[in-house]
C-alpha cells in the first residue's frame, strides 16, 4: 500500500475530527455541516478499502499536522490563505423579491431531503420563472439561500427553502427539489423556466427554453404524473 495514500487518509481523518469539534461548538454554518456529513461517508468508505481503523488514523493524523504546523512560517500560511478559493454569492432576486411575504390560495407543502417546497396549486396557465439566490464555489452551486417561482406579473407562486432543522444540502438535493417544483407547477398547465444563472451553476449549462435536464428519476416521476392526469381526464369525459 502506498505510504502517501495512508498518510493522506490519516490527515483527512484528523481534519474531519477538528471540523466536527467546530460543529459541536455551534460555530459551523450550513455548507460547513453539509461537507462534514459527506466527508464522513467518504472516510468510512476509504477506511474500509484501506483496512485502516479511523480512530487510530486520526491520532496519527494529528501528529502529522502538529509537525507541519511547528515547521510552518506565518508568511507561508498567509500565502496559502490568499490563494485559497472563496465562495461567491449570486443573486437572481432583488432584496424586495427575496424578503416579500406571499400567500397561497391552495397551499401544498412537501419536504424533499433537507429542503422544503411550497406551491400554490391555484395557479393555472401562467408563464413562470424560477429565480434563486445562492453561493457558488468552483463554478458549482454550493448553498441555496432561497428559490422562488414568479409569474410574469411578479406574483410569487412557489418556493424552495432550506429546513432550519436539517442544515446542509447537496447540489443534487437542490436539483431534485427543483424537479419536484417544476412538476407541481406544470400539473396545472403552467409553463416553467429556470433562470440562466441557476441553470449554469446547478447543471453546468443553460438552455434557451429555460429547462434544465431532468434526472432519470425526475423523468419517471413526471411520466407517471402525466399518465395519471390523462386517466383522470378520460374518466371525467
Curated annotation (Swiss-Prot):
Keyword Cell cycle: no
Keywords: Eukaryotic host gene expression shutoff by virus, Host cytoplasm, Host gene expression shutoff by virus, Host mRNA suppression by virus, Host nucleus, Host-virus interaction, Inhibition of host innate immune response by virus, Inhibition of host interferon signaling pathway by virus, Inhibition of host PKR by virus, Inhibition of host pre-mRNA processing by virus, Inhibition of host RIG-I by virus, Inhibition of host RLR pathway by virus, Interferon antiviral system evasion, RNA-binding, Ubl conjugation, Viral immunoevasion
Molecular-function annotations in GO: protein serine/threonine kinase inhibitor activity; RNA binding
Region of interest (Disordered), ranges: 205-237
Record's comment on post-translational modification: Upon interferon induction, ISGylated via host HERC5; this results in the impairment of NS1 interaction with RNA targets due to its inability to form homodimers and to interact with host EIF2AK2/PKR.
Motif (Nuclear localization signal): 34-38
Region (CPSF4-binding): 180-215
Family (UniProt): Belongs to the influenza A viruses NS1 family.
Subunit architecture: Homodimer. Interacts with host TRIM25 (via coiled coil); this interaction specifically inhibits TRIM25 multimerization and TRIM25-mediated RIGI CARD ubiquitination. Interacts with human EIF2AK2/PKR, CPSF4, IVNS1ABP and PABPN1.
Function recorded in the entry: Inhibits post-transcriptional processing of cellular pre-mRNA, by binding and inhibiting two cellular proteins that are required for the 3'-end processing of cellular pre-mRNAs: the 30 kDa cleavage and polyadenylation specificity factor/CPSF4 and the poly(A)-binding protein 2/PABPN1. In turn, unprocessed 3' end pre-mRNAs accumulate in the host nucleus and are no longer exported to the cytoplasm. Cellular protein synthesis is thereby shut off very early after virus infection.
Name assigned to this protein: Non-structural protein 1
